[in-house]
Amino acid sequence: YKSLEDLIKLGFDRVLTSGQEATVPEGADLLEELVQIAGDRIIVMPGCGITERNFPKLRDKIKAKEYHIYLPYETMSKMKFHPGHIYMGGLLRQSEFTITHTSSSRVSDVMGTL
């Protein structure tokens, strides 16, 4: 817990973390401990892999004050030319022809569970 204490001593007011795991569901045990240890000295903000489905369970276990949740939807871009063999976004070959937005209705649904 030294890193958490170091952040507090340095004056940080918030830390975004998945609990030293790839996602919050995997790091939930450590996140629960960090939130308890931090108390009101720093906000531990769990983030990565939180969905509408797992949020209630994670919220009840971790008991953080804030959460970072990605709730997207996509729309088609207005691009006319779609060369399917050229990828500008790197090796993962993500769509070049969509725009990702935050879904306000999904956010409202999650907020309604608080």
Residue ranges and their predicted role:
Residues G27-I37, K57-I62, M76-L114:
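C-terminal helical cap(s) of enzyme catalytic domains, especially alpha/beta-barrels
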Residues D13, I43-M45, D109:
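A general secondary-structure boundary signal
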